[in-house]
Amino acid sequence: KTYDVTTASHPVGESVLARTSMSYLGRFTDPETGTVVKSDFLAQFHCSETFAFPDSVKDHKITKSEIKLYIDKFIGDSLTSFKLSVYPLNKVMDPEVDYYTNIEPSKYYDTNQKPIAVKWFTLSDRTIDDETRWDLDYYNSINISLPVSIGQAIYEGYINNPDAFTNTDKWANSGIPGSKGFYFKLEAGDR
């Protein structure tokens, strides 16, 4: 049987409200239309009122700084390679402002600065064994190593000024590296 189908496109505006705790990262090219949909994101981190560094920090030295971006769902080939660059934000994002999907990231970071981290990754992490991957406690993530100096500066900020860690507003305005957040920019890869 043959069926006639009619479709129509309707504009919804330049952007939509982006107030969410979910972030989207990637690039997808529609094979039918050639339309490219790309998504990067800005992230500002919450500091809980009960935050405390663990007593396990030995000799006041941080040995590793890492951000994990947890993956809930994805489309496309899980073995496609992507390149992600991470830039520190130089401006606090106002929690009272509604941000839209047409936000200009360049207003929040130094475009002349090199990224503080670059990560090539696939959505299916091939660096772990199958036993770990299929464990019920495993959460798929993109693990991004940051300069240890950022972790050390955050730790020293906590030791020297614990009040900066008592709530998100104080943390974001503390001037401590990483406190304003990061821009996660997709540089290469297509679903």
Annotated model-derived regions:
Residues 1-191:
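Secreted, disulfide-rich extracellular signaling modules
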